[in-house]
Structure formats: C-alpha cells, structure tokens
Amino acid sequence: MYVMSQTTNTEDTIDLKELFFSLIAQWKLIALCIILSLICALLYLRATPDTYSVNALVQVEENKGASAALLGDLSSMIEQKQPAQAEIEILKSRLVLGNVIQHLNLDLKISGTENSFTDRLLSPHHYQTEYQPKSVLFKDDEKVFDIRQFNIPASFRDKKIELRFKDGQFSLTNTQTEQVILTGKTNQSNTLRTADGLWNISIYTQDQLNDVYLIQKQSLPAAVNNILTNYSVAEKGKLTGILGLNYQGTDKTHITQVLNAILVSYSQQNIERRSAETAQTLKFLDEQLPELKQQLDVAEREFNKFRQQYNTVDVTKESELFLTQSVTLETQKAQLEQQVAEAGAKYTSEHPVMKQMNAQLGAINKKIGELNATLKELPDLQRRYLQLYREVEVKQQLYTALLNSYQQLRIAKAGEIGNVRIVDTAVEPIEPIAPKKLQILILSIFLGGFLGTLLALLRNMMRSGIKDSTQIENELDLPVYATVPRSPVQESRINILKKKKNIPILAVKNSDDIAIESLRSMRTAIHFALSSARNNLITISGPAPEVGKSFISTNLATILAQSDKRVLIIDADLRRGYLHKYFNLDTQPGLTELLNGQQSLETVIRHTEVPGLSVISRGKSPANPSELLSSNQFKNLLEQMSEKFDHVIIDTPPVLAVTDGIIISQYTGVNLVIARYAKTQMKELELTLNRFEQAGVKVNGFILNDIQRSSAGYGYGYGYNYAYAYKANKESD
C-alpha cells in the first residue's frame, strides 16, 4: 500500500511539473494575451470619460405645523412624523426636479454626431455643454454656440434633430425622414409656424460652424428620468433624519451645479408648504376672531344691562363654585370646538384623532348638562346672573386665547424657515470616481494572464500527440533511437527559413546545437543496426508531413560525413521534397530525370560543401512517382550507390499519405520512422507499422523529434540542462 501511494504521488508530481513546463514553453502566448489585454484597457481608458461624484446632506427636523398653535397639547397627538422615505420620494419627485430642469434648461440635450465609442477613440473632438438659467452653451473644441430659445412642438419632443450651420444660418433636419424642418438665421430670434406647431428658436454664435450636431428637447418625464439615472437619495443610518444626496456625471462643474439647485428647490418647496399651512390657519382665525369678538360684546352688554337693572346680587359660596366650574367647562368646550373645526380641514370624521376629540367633546357636554341641571335649582335671579357672567368669562378667555395664537402665527409666518436644514452643500470634486485606471490596468494584466494561461492549457490539451519516448517503446515494442530537442536557432528562424530558397544546415552552422548533439549520439545505434542489416541503405520516413524528416535526414547525413564517411542523401519525395534548399541547389537535374533516362548518374549526383557528402535532388515532379520508384532502374540505382558509398540516406514521402515510402523501404536495410513531439498521434504510428508489416518490411526504430525544452519531462529536461551547461562552460573556456 505504501509503495502504491508513493508511486501515485510521484506520477502526480511529474504531471504537475509537465503542466508547469508546458505553460513556460508557451510564455509568448501568455505574454501576447497580457499585452493585448493591456492595449484593450488603455483604449477603454482613452475612450471612456472620467466620472465624478458630488454629495450633499439634508437634515429633516421634527415637523411642527401652524396648527400646533391652536391644538396645544393635542398637537402631539395629531402631528404625524414624516418618515425619511417620504422626504426621499419628494427629493426625487417632479415637483423638485422639474423646477431644477426648468431653471437650468436641463431638458435640452446637445451632442456631436461623432460620439460613439469608436469616435471618441479616434476623434479629437472635445464636446462640453454648459447649462445656464437663460441659455445653454455648447462648446466644440474652440467653437461655441449659445441656444437661448428652443421652443418646439410637442410632437418633436424626445426626438433627435440634426442641427447644421452654414454661412450664418442654421437648419433643423428630421433624423427619421431626413427632411429639413426649418431654416433660420443665427444671432436673432426665429419664429415659424408649421403644420406641427409653433417653433421659436434663437441660436447665437460668433464662430464659423460647419459641423453637424444632434439636439433633443426632452419632455419633463424624460428629463426627470435622465437625472434619476445618476441621482440617488438615501438615509444615513436608521431613523437619523439625515438624508444623503449623490449625483454623478462626467462634467464635475455641471453635476455640482445641478445638485445645489436640487437642494435649493427642495428647501423652497418645503418652506412654501409650511407657509401655506400657516396662511390657511391665519385665514381661519381671520374669519373666527370678528365673530367671536361680536359674541363677546353681546355677552358683555347683556351682563352689564342685568347689573344696572338689579344693582347687586348676593351670590352664595356654592353658587360661586358652580360658576367657576361652569366657566371652565364652557371654555374647554369652546376651545375643543375650535380644534375640531381646525382638524376637520385635515382629517375625516372617521380618523382616530377626530373620534377622540369628539369623544372628549361629548364628555364635556355631559358635565355641562349635569351642572346646568344643578344651576336650575338655584333662585331665578342668581341663576340668571351666573349664566350671564359665565357667558362673558367663556367668550373672554376664548377670544384672548385665539388672539394670542393669531399674533404668534403672524410672527411665525414672518420668520418661516421650514423643517429641513441643508447640512452640507455640493462641492466640486477633485478626483474622478471612475474609471479606476490603476485597478483596470492591474485587472487587465491578471485577465490577460488568465486568458493566456487558459489558451495555453487548451492548446496543450489539443496537442494530444506523443510526449514521451517510453510511450512508444511500451506500446509498439520498438526502440527510440534518439530524442531530438527543438533547436533554439531553428525555432527563432523557422518562419524566415520557410520563405528562403536556401536553408542552412544546422550541423554546419551550429555544430554544438543540442539537436545536433542528440543526432550524434544516434550514430552508435545506427552502426549496430547496420551491422546486422542486409545493406547500408537507410530510409527516413514518417506517418504525416511536417514531422521533420528532411531536417533529420540532412543533419544526420552531415554528421555521418563529418566522421570521414562517404554519404549520399537522396530526396525520394518526388512530389514535395525540398532537400535541394539545404544545399543551395536547383531541383533539376535530379532523381526524376535519372529514372526517366533523361540524365546520367554522374550528372544527378552533386557534391556539397560538406566533405564526403553528396546529394541527389528530387528533380521535376513527375506524373507517376510510384511507378518510377518501383522500377528496376531505381532498384539498380540503390544497389550501385550502396557499393559506392558508406551510407545512403533516403528521405521518403509520408507513409500514410502515399505508398512511395513503403516501396522504397523494401530495398533498404534500416528503416527509421520520425515522430514529432506533441503532434504525431500514437494511432498514426500504429497505422504506419501496419503498412510496413503488410509489405513485409521491418521497422528498426523511431526518432522522436522537436521535443520542447520547457515542456519536457524530467529526463528530457536533464538532457537539456546538461547540454546548455556544457555549452556555457565551453564558451567560457
């Protein structure tokens, strides 16, 4: 159990290491994604205007209306405290925002026609709109025009209209029908009546304007909604009565101006509402005081008349007590009736406050009835005296109370300030709140790195080819003669080399390259394979194109020639062979011309700059390459070359594409198959072996080509590191 667990952990570690190295191998892809992500972020920051935010604070104080002067102690019962949510809705209402829109002409929207994301990215135009109480000023870089009147028919509200300037005139064009609505002169008032309605427009400018602009007169609901998209109100804390106002926009001066205008409008409507309540109460008192004064005068005349007629009346202590109680009850009744009349203007009879006040009034009437019944038992003269005296006292106290309330309300109206207090006004911001440039750049780096890593992983998953030589040896039971790493020199010049007519031989130009060192290590294995082979002919084949057959063939032939061997390399890929590019030769004369009898053997065998190395190019592409390669002429050619040279290397076409490689391998002693790292599939190698077996040909082994350094496993990585360390020491020597 322990051994199995340890093996599993080791395999997992190797897998993670291979994954890590595969990402390092694709660092260019990841870096490219990061760069592209940064470029996109920079373009976004260039095209996105800065967004600013302004704030203000409002305190909503306890609401004590003018009716409190009349209701007295009952005002605490009648008064309804307005929650913060009610004031928030008022701050968002058309009542408040409509005044701001009308005052600053915020219902007029002007923009350039080049205002899309792409236009802002490429166009140098800088547009700015300044809203003023009497006009709207629009700036296009250094050019300015001022709209002082723009009254249009209702049918054109909320519609974009093209505004064009030319030769001191302007024209308005319907963007939907592209028809000119009207034409007017600048720097004067223009009035025109059309079938749609009356137009009254005044545009002033001192500049020569030749551009086209879009102008829109919004309806009140649309203008309010336009403000509400960037405007918010919320209570600070819970039940604090402090409201926080926030407004955002791209023009910091404009948003500060708008938010302060909202504060002024809200404060004014609050004062006007409270003043209206006070005025309503004063109007009620103006109606009640003269009538009450008249009633008091009548009561006093009756009482004085009674006293003159009967001089003085002996009133007992008991009668005085009844009189005091009666006056108190009648005064309370009169005051309560006044309160009921005042509250009746605000509440229905079913309101709890009205029900409670009516219940109190009923209780007082009941007590007055009981007291009147007691007073009837007194002597007639005393009873009449008490009634008249009570009437005078009640009217006097009630009149005095209402007169005091009236004077207090007049003073309150003169100093009315409302129940809201502006704690903080809007102050022009300094720094924008968006876009957050540093965060966006950092995020773009992480996003680019993530996308690059994801693409690298997907690319690695798609590259499901052979990545380990042991996989070939275990599944196909054949040796891998060499694992050839990707040459750093070849990798850096691969795109250039494909386009050139001449491809340099790596074994000549960079003889100490790690790929060449791997091929040198294969010489011993080839020597043992040839010792038991029927001849010295070696075929280099592969299952598919672009596995590196020509690269391996050329450099292997060069290495063998450098060890004082006579080597011939034949380009048997008569369709697409390009061995001639390695030796800076023409394709003709070549193998095709030799087999067709058009050229002699001495003519097609050409010597190269590498001592001991000769080459036969493919020649002109024939119509029947398979027939030529299966002919006796080709067989005889190979037999002659086998005797003349120490090694004959034949570069063949892909086995799975055409049968040429199988035909050639029937004549050779050693057959090697090239597999490309992470590209060649195991299934391709199995099919290739089946093709050879069907033809009765033995495959000696494989060469795993183009192993990438950073994505190699432990064994490959060790070989790489050793080669690089050895090369570095050599250079230092």
UniProtKB/Swiss-Prot annotation:
Chain positions recorded as ATP binding sites: G542, P543, A544, P545, E546, V547, G548, K549, S550
Protein's pathway: Glycan metabolism; exopolysaccharide biosynthesis
Subcellular location: Cell inner membrane
GO CC terms in record: plasma membrane
CDD domains found in the cross-reference section: BY-kinase
Top EC class, one word: transferase
Protein's name according to its UniProt entry: Tyrosine-protein kinase ptk
